[in-house]
Amino acid sequence: IVGGVEAVPGVWPYQAALFIIDMYFCGGSLI
């Protein structure tokens, strides 16, 4: 979901995720 609208697969190919000690905290797309 980008800006509250479902994104088309492949449109935002770069993603970031924050993991601390194997626990997922947050994620986002790099634009």
UniProtKB/Swiss-Prot annotation:
GO terms under cellular component: extracellular region
Catalytic activity: Preferential cleavage: Tyr-|-Xaa, Trp-|-Xaa, Phe-|-Xaa, Leu-|-Xaa
Enzyme type, top EC level: hydrolase
A GO term for molecular function: serine-type endopeptidase activity
Organism superkingdom: Eukaryota
UniProt cross-references to Pfam families, sorted A to Z: Trypsin (PF00089)
UniProt key word Hydrolase: yes
Main location: secreted
GO biological process, one term: proteolysis
Residue ranges constituting the Peptidase S1 domain according to the UniProt record: 1-31
Localization per Swiss-Prot or TrEMBL: Secreted, Extracellular space
EC number of this enzyme: 3.4.21.1
Keywords per UniProt: Hydrolase, Protease, Secreted, Serine protease
KW Protease (keyword) present: yes
Family membership noted in the UniProt record: Belongs to the peptidase S1 family.
UniProt name for this protein: Chymotrypsin
Organism: Penaeus monodon (Giant tiger prawn)
